[in-house]
Amino acid sequence: MIDASVWEPKGGLKFDDKSLGIIKCNSNISIMAGPGAGKTEILAQKACFILETELCAWPYNILSISRKRESASNIKNRVSLRCGKVLSERFHSFTIEAFTKSIVDRFMYVLHKHEQLSDGYELVYNVRDSNFKDKLTFDQLTILALKIVHFSPDLMSTIRATYKYIFIDEFQDLNGHQYNFVKAIFCKSQSVVTVVGDTKQAIMKFANALPDGFIKFERDFQAELKVIHTNFRSSPELKRFIDNIGNEWWPMLNVNIEANIDYAKLNKDNYSLFGFDDEEHEAKQLSLKIKQWIDKDNIRPEEIAVLFRVNSNNYYSQNISNELLNLGVLSVNESNLQDYLSEPLGKILISLLTLFTRTRNVDAWECLRDLYLHCYSSNSFDEDYKLSQILEFINNSKYYNEGADKTFENLLDDSVKFMNDFFHEKLDEVWIQYKQGTLRDDTFHGILDELKEAKNLSSSWTEAVDLISGVGAVRMMTIHKSKGLEFEAVILLGLEDCSYFRFGMTSKKLDEERSTIFVALSRAKSKLLISSALNRKHTGQSEFIHVNTIINDLTKFGINKMRVETSDALKI
């Protein structure tokens, strides 16, 4: 145990008085943190403080709830890094959907028989596809979980007794059902609740995210509001630009915005909005720019992101991906892969594939070992024996040197055998999300299908595994998937009506898409390019009637708008 008065932040990091006060706060608190404010680090340090000072002593735990799987995974990894494996075992990180599903799956039996779901029920996205028996939406699942905890006071008491501290990340994206669920369990309890978010980055408004969630939380939980403005991510000029855009779109009351604007001077080489004639020329020019960043500016490919509002059938990513490949630059489309890799099964599989394709990789081995030991509790002799069996299996399944010519079918067989031999019986027991539905099969085959495709673009299995892991590859994803990530350079592709205002514009829709754009802008550290094309094969002639409202604001505050003719070479 460390005394709270002498506790210091981990990793040699220093925090200002406000951030340190948030870390050490032992009452309900809401934190409004702008882009680049380091909220993941602050939450990780707060978890360390709570665990190391024994404010949350064994057998109590910390519950962390996120909206996205990768966010839940990121905060768990950061806490493990900051306070070590043993203490971080008591930091339980879930998505809100996974947490509510775990309650439904484990305690559904407390309901009347006619209210219980069928075995193997399926989660659907559209309420029209649900029947509340064997098919239901995530909102219906949350409503059912809320009914269960209301129906069973003992269960509610158990949850409260298990989790003394609660973190809720991306709080602005919780909808009414999810907020009511959290409120029902933890409001007026002994649990201490911390919520973190940024209303400017509320990208789940289309899913009925609460517009006044922070106000409700402060009122219901008697919480204090703290605001962190500091942006540690972006360059000074980009930070100024982002701040100005945020103030223009969501002005504070009783503040003369125009009088307080410090206009950013943005270099056109690093911050521009390009208009191309068609998507082919767009892809060629932007690929050359990415190649220039890699070769001349020494930016690693994985530090470059190409973002889109939507990417159905890879319409937006395919052209630029092909052009990059012609230049010898690999890219990976993470829109689906990102979810798979954030799963425990995804981490097991990617660690295994890494060890299949390299003589040794310490990080991959430690990840695989820790996940295996997490599944099995046994004595040290049994552990050593089982781990030696895993190592023997890996050594006999090489996909480099003499094994470099093995086929995908060989790799699939080895992967299936490994999972059956070492993880199968425990997988859905330890991680309940695999008990029902298709998530286990989707994750396993989703990753291997991506690997098969990556092998067609690579000269070896090692390169293919690197590619799907995002090593040495430009990353392509939707803006929603980029939430919480940061990159040295960002290209926002397809700023046109079809992507953002296909069904027209209302004030609500404009506010929603401003938040989406704001998330994209704030992913960049030092370079930000925005692109549109007058023609695309899948949409035809592009229109800018509605999106011009956003474009005009971007140029007003410093983004350079440039027309790039088809005849132009690397004008950009």
Identify the residue ranges that each predicted region occupies.
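P-loop NTPase Walker
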Residues: 1-108, 522
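Conserved RecA-like helicase ATPase core segment
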Residues: 5, 11, 48, 181-267
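Conserved helicase/translocase P-loop NTPase motor core
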Residues: 93, 129-165, 175-181, 460-463, ...
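Conserved helicase core region in the C-terminal RecA-like lobe
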Residues: 93-102, 196, 452-505, 512-535
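Helicase P-loop NTPase motor core
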Residues: 223-224, 231-327
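ATPase/helicase motor core of nucleic-acid motors
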Residues: 298-425, 432
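Accessory C-terminal helicase-associated subdomains
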Residues: 376-481, 502, 558
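C-terminal accessory regions
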Residues: 388-406, 496-572
